[in-house]
UniProtKB/Swiss-Prot annotation:
This protein's UniProt keywords: mRNA transport, Nuclear pore complex, Nucleus, Protein transport, Translocation, Transport
Gene3D superfamilies (alphabetical): 1.10.3450.20, 1.20.190.50
Subcellular localization, as worded in the UniProt entry: Nucleus envelope; Nucleus, Nuclear pore complex
Subunit: Part of the nuclear pore complex (NPC). The NPC has an eight-fold symmetrical structure comprising a central transport channel and two rings, the cytoplasmic and nuclear rings, to which eight filaments are attached. The cytoplasmic filaments have loose ends, while the nuclear filaments are joined in a distal ring, forming a nuclear basket. NPCs are highly dynamic in configuration and composition, and can be devided in 3 subcomplexes, the NUP62 subcomplex, the NUP107-160 subcomplex and the NUP93 subcomplex, containing approximately 30 different nucleoporin proteins.
Classification via InterPro entries: Nup84/Nup107
Taxonomic superkingdom: Eukaryota
Protein name: Nuclear pore complex protein NUP107
GO MF annotation list: structural constituent of nuclear pore
Length: 1101
């Protein structure tokens, strides 16, 4: 990708404080309504098909029947497979994104591989993921609709992660094997890491910033009040404060969990556990020795350079370890209570020196202290901040003295926390969170101390000179001479200079525990450190680097927790987009859109691979327009042969979260998705034929694949969407339009007189039965544009009904031919089938008011210079046996010449007819035929009253009908009393006899002089269908009539059929080829001969 991976926007630079202040990283507190959670939980349930108790309004009969079937099949199971666990409400907010060429190439590479990769990834997180997919989607859906504030969303995400983690780790009493238990611990830990990241994001970007209450502003001010105001206004200090509070909050929640699970936590000791009972008894009994202290006051071990007895020492260290743990969790009061209960009230006094006041520099601590004026009184007497500096200096001296005498490490650390003595805290910080807390808290306290020291004259210059010196010079040169008035020079050079230096110290500091260094390499720690730095750009890059397919192995994910990171990354992208709406520059906006779309796309396909199709729409709706469309098209194609239930979930997901029609250039919409699906379903696929099965038959079966695509338009849209009636009408219109296109193609490959039913056409009819039934129940929704397409659909419905009855009759004929003697019942069945076939065919052929397949054109061009017509066809050449003729250059050239010869040379010149035949680039068994000619009045210009498709239809019909031995452009007369029929038409010449074209795709267009296609010329294809279907229907009727006559059941309307063909008014004669008319006359001859034979039998005695 053409993006700078090492830089971030300037407003995320921790050094550029003024810019960061303008960015308003810390927002004003939002007022949270108690109704928000209720709103988010009461999201519309209309979107679920089945929620465990009720079936929700899918009106499609096929879908309802399949739901019932699945319920019966799964009657004894507790979980309904494929059903979402939580109701998801509609989302209308979408994101924007623009890719450059490199990003687009990367996106397409990922799209082509990600679904396969998602399918074979490790399923370690499947169990826990199933409980969070729908939950997280529901939360984000509520946030996108404005039902939940963004800060509240972050808190809910953290809470959800914690709850699921606890459920995995402690929710089951079942004993697991060692490997399973390890995996469950890993899952729970990953979710805790995610919860920590959400908590940090809330502390940094979601938590409000309170102002100092007016009633707490004191005059003269106090050191604590000044410290709180400084931290409130200084960006770096505020950042440190929030990091410290975040880490203390994590530690506190960990203690609560320990108490919840184990029933107890730190500090649960017997009273007076720290009174050194063993040492007391030893002194009373044995006196003392050199190594044992002589007095029992709290300062005795340090003053006498002596030790407690081992048992008391261990007990004391245990108490101090718990005191440290409570301080680390921000529970100072509990730590003081522990000290008092252990008999060490003096230690509690060292923790809270100012009458128990909380001296933490936060507004919360200030409010907690209330209007207490103790500190103000103290500082009025001793001077501003003097007592505070004295206390910290004393704590520093104590920590150093105890450390020098190898005292307890926790006692050293407890004193060190009071004075920012980082070097004495880090040795007991054996995890990343503790080390980060120690550094951030020390740095925060020193920043506050430096600010408070500004009131002392001359001290500022000493601070600057001390900072300029190296840490070694400061440590060895003048630190020993520092007194309380010099605070905080004693610990100044222990602190980082900025936040990147703090994080670098975590990575490679000499005093940092190796476990801390290892923790820096964990994924969520890296995420959290980038959030602290505000380097969101780099954060997106590293998340994408973790989940992107490997360059050398596109079929697999990297084996380090990618499913979890995909989910987290997608949700992080959505939160960041909601947070940074108007406050970002173009470069960062581009990064957030580009890389964010890649991550969202990956997660959407991951959900798809886990059969959570109903959740995909929430995330897909946030993708850029083209990505959203491509994603849904890809999913629909992969689920093309899935159950109705699964396909309906995808349909609902798209309908609910996307607009139906295009709204702008940024957002995806259902119309474009379904148009792309339908268009791609008609494309010629790369040839993959089974050599053991006839290629031509496999080619005809492709019609089923085209028909299945129409089902996406036949579902009932949910009643919750906007303008549902209008959407329903548009779906019906598109389904009718596309079905008519397919019906035309299917009719041209269903000319073979075999019993097999054309599966594609009848699949279309079955899909459209339900929408048309609903249309009949609501006739008010029928608009003119729907009516026109509906009329053609009804024509095709009638035609395929005739076709089905003919094939049913043909089936009887073939079955009866194998039996020597038929029973009366079998004969009667054949006769009934024949009469039904003949009656339905004549009903279609004899229509007077609205002849079959004759309509007014949508686009009628009266006059236009250089308007051309084009017909594009992809077809397979078939021998008379039905087998495929594989084309080569010679065959193509011969067919092209034959098509030219099917019309006169005068027509070729006048109409500028051009014919091109070539082998298909995608299927070597198929040919591509392109016909082009000049439009003239009556054929392209003005109304087309002949309804025969014009010259292009005539040339194409010659190819579909094939050639006989005498193929040419002909005109002659048949005389067969009592009728005289003049014959003319187009035939192929100089081409193999009996070879016909089986259509794969057929389109006709109006085109410009330059060859650009303008609008469809539907009349050409309809006319072609009339040229091919009506003569075939007549011939089939003749075949059935002959059969009835031979069986002694003469049809009543045979002469009417002959008159229909011979009549000039119907124009049927122009639709026949010479070969078809020859067959027609042969059938008529057979009919007359059978009639004479029957008359002779009846007249004979």
């Amino acid at each position: 990708m053409d993006m700078d991976m090492d830089t971030s926007p300037s407003y995320f630079d921790p050094e550029a404080l003024s810019v960061r202040d303008q960015f308003r990283r810390y927002r004003k507190r939002h007022s949270t309504s108690p109704h928000e959670e209720m709103l988010s939980s009461n999201v519309s349930e209309n979107r679920l098909l089945y929620d465990g108790h009720n079936i929700h309004s899918p009106t499609n009969t096929a879908l309802l029947l399949e739901n019932i079937k699945e319920e019966v099949d799964n009657f004894h199971t507790d979980h309904y497979e494929g059903t979402p666990t939580n109701p998801i409400s509609a989302s209308r907010r979408e994101s924007v994104g623009i890719l450059n060429d490199d990003d687009e190439a990367l996106f397409r590479r990922v799209e082509s591989q990600s679904l396969k990769a998602c399918k074979i990834e490790n399923d370690e997180l499947a169990e826990s993921g199933d409980t969070t997919f729908a939950l997280f989607a529901s939360l984000f859906d509520s946030a996108l609709q404005g039902l939940m504030s963004i800060p509240n969303l972050m808190l809910r995400l953290e809470e959800s992660c914690r709850n699921v983690s606890q459920s995995i780790r402690y929710g089951s009493d079942i004993r697991h094997r060692a490997v399973e238990d390890k995996l469950m611990r890993q899952k729970a830990q990953l979710l805790l890491g995610e919860a920590a990241s959400w908590s940090l994001l809330w502390n940094l970007y979601g938590k409000g910033t309170d102002e100092v209450p007016e009633n707490l502003i004191l005059i003269p001010s106090t050191s604590h009040l000044e410290a709180c105001q400084f931290v409130l206004n200084d960006h770096t200090a505020q950042l440190c404060l929030r990091i410290v509070m975040w880490l203390e909050e994590l530690a506190s929640k960990s203690l609560d969990l320990e108490r919840k699970v184990q029933g107890s936590h730190v500090g649960t000791y017997l009273p007076n556990a720290g009174v050194w009972h063993h040492t007391q008894r030893y002194l009373k009994k044995n006196g003392s020795n050199a190594d044992t202290l002589h007095h029992l006051d709290f300062d005795a071990p340090t003053r006498e350079h002596a030790r407690l007895l081992p048992d008391d020492y261990k007990q004391d260290e245990s108490v101090l370890e718990d005191v440290w743990t409570l301080i680390r969790a921000g529970r100072i009061e509990e730590a003081c209570d522990l000290c008092r209960s252990a008999g060490q009230s003096w230690r509690a006094a060292t923790l809270c020196p100012f009458s128990g006041m909380d001296m933490f520099p936060s507004i919360e601590a200030l409010v907690k202290n209330g209007e207490n004026r103790t500190l103000q009184a103290i500082e009025q007497e001793s001077g501003f901040g003097n007592q505070l500096r004295l206390w910290k200096w004393a704590s520093y001296c104590a920590s150093e003295k105890i450390a020098e005498q190898d005292g307890g490490k926790h006692e050293v650390a407890v004193f060190a926390t009071q004075c920012s003595n980082l070097n004495r805290m880090l040795p007991i910080c054996t995890d990343w969170e503790s080390a980060c807390w120690a550094m951030a808290k020390s740095w925060l306290d020193v920043q506050v101390d430096l600010e408070l020291a500004q009131s002392k004259p001359g001290l500022t210059e000493r601070f600057k000179s001390c900072i300029d010196e190296s840490p070694e010079a400061t440590q060895n040169g003048c630190q020993a001479s520092f007194g309380p008035e010099d605070w905080p020079l004693h610990v100044l050079n222990q602190q980082p200079r900025d936040l990147p230096a703090l994080l670098q110290k975590l990575h490679s500091g000499e005093m940092v525990h190796e476990a801390v260094v290892r923790g820096c390499k964990e994924q969520h720690r890296q995420i959290q450190m980038n959030l602290m730095l505000g380097d969101i750009s780099h954060l997106l890059d590293i998340i994408w680097s973790w989940i992107a397919p490997l360059e050398d192995d596109q079929s697999n994910f990297r084996p380090h927790g990618d499913p979890h990171m995909i989910k987290f990354g997608a949700h992080m992208v959505l939160v960041l987009r909601l947070l940074f709406t108007d406050e970002i520059n173009d470069s960062f906006k581009e990064k957030l859109n580009n890389v964010g779309d890649l991550i969202l796309h990956m997660y959407a396909m991951f959900l798809f691979s886990k059969q959570h199709e109903e959740l995909v729409g929430i995330y897909a709706s946030q993708l850029a327009r083209h990505r959203c469309i491509e994603l849904f098209v890809h999913m629909m194609e992969l689920r093309m042969h899935s159950s109705v239930h699964v396909k309906y979930k995808i349909f609902l997901s798209a309908m609910e979260y996307l607009s139906f029609s295009p709204v702008d250039d940024l957002h995806g919409n259902f119309e474009e998705i379904v148009d792309r699906v339908l268009s791609r379903s008609r494309e010629i696929k790369l040839a993959k034929y089974d050599p053991s099965i006839d290629v031509a038959e496999q080619h005809r079966q492709q019609s089923l694949q085209k028909a299945i695509a129409i089902q996406w338009l036949c579902f009932t849209p949910p009643s919750t969407i906007k303008d549902v009636k209008d959407v329903t009408s548009k779906l019906l219109l598109r389904s009718l339009m596309h079905s008519n296109i397919l019906f035309r193609e299917f009719a041209l490959i269903a000319m073979w007189r075999v019993p097999a039913t054309p599966v594609g056409a009848h699949t279309l009819l079955s899909y459209l039965a339900e929408p048309l039934k609903q249309l009949s129940e609501n006739p008010d929704t029928l608009e003119d544009y729907v009516s026109e397409n509906l009329q053609e659909f009804q024509d095709w419905n009638e035609y395929y009904s005739c076709d089905a009855k003919y094939r049913n009759w043909l089936k009887f004929q073939l079955e009866n031919a194998e039996v020597t003697e038929l029973s009366e019942e079998e004969n009667q069945k054949a006769v009934v089938a024949a009469k039904e076939t003949l009656d339905s065919s004549l009903s279609l052929l004899l229509r007077q008011d609205n002849p079959w397949m004759t309509f007014l054109e949508d686009h009628v061009f009266e006059s236009e210079e250089y308007l051309f017509l084009e017909l594009h066809a992809t077809a397979m050449l078939c021998l008379p046996s039905g087998e495929c003729l594989r084309p080569d250059a010679t065959v193509c050239a011969a067919l092209m010449s034959a098509l030219y010869s099917s019309v006169s040379e005068e027509v070729v010149l006048d109409r500028q007819l051009m014919v091109n035949v070539s082998i298909s680039s995608r299927d070597s068994y198929c040919i591509e035929v392109v016909l082009r000619c000049l439009a003239i009045k009556g054929d392209g210009l003005g109304p087309h009253n002949a309804n025969d498709g014009g010259i292009l239809s005539a040339v194409a019909a010659a190819g579909f009908k094939g050639s006989d031995i005498y193929g040419t452009y002909f005109s002659f007369t048949y005389d067969l009393p009592p009728f005289s029929i003049e014959i003319w038409g187009c035939e192929l010449t100089r081409f193999q006899a009996g070879v016909t074209m089986d259509i794969s795709r057929l389109d006709a267009w109006y085109s410009s002089k330059e060859g650009s296609l303008e609008t469809p010329a539907t009349y050409i294809v309809r006319g072609l269908c009339r040229r091919c279907c009506l003569p075939e229907l007549v011939l089939r009727s003749m075949q059935v009539s002959v059969s009835l006559m031979e069986s002694g059941n003469p049809p009543e309307d045979h002469d009417e059929l002959i008159e229909l063909v011979a009549s000039d008014e119907t124009g049927f004669l122009s639709l026949f080829s010479r070969q078809q008319l020859q067959e027609f006359m042969l059938f008529e001859r057979e009919y007359r001969m059978s009639q004479l034979e029957l008359q002779e039998e009846l007249s004979s005695p």
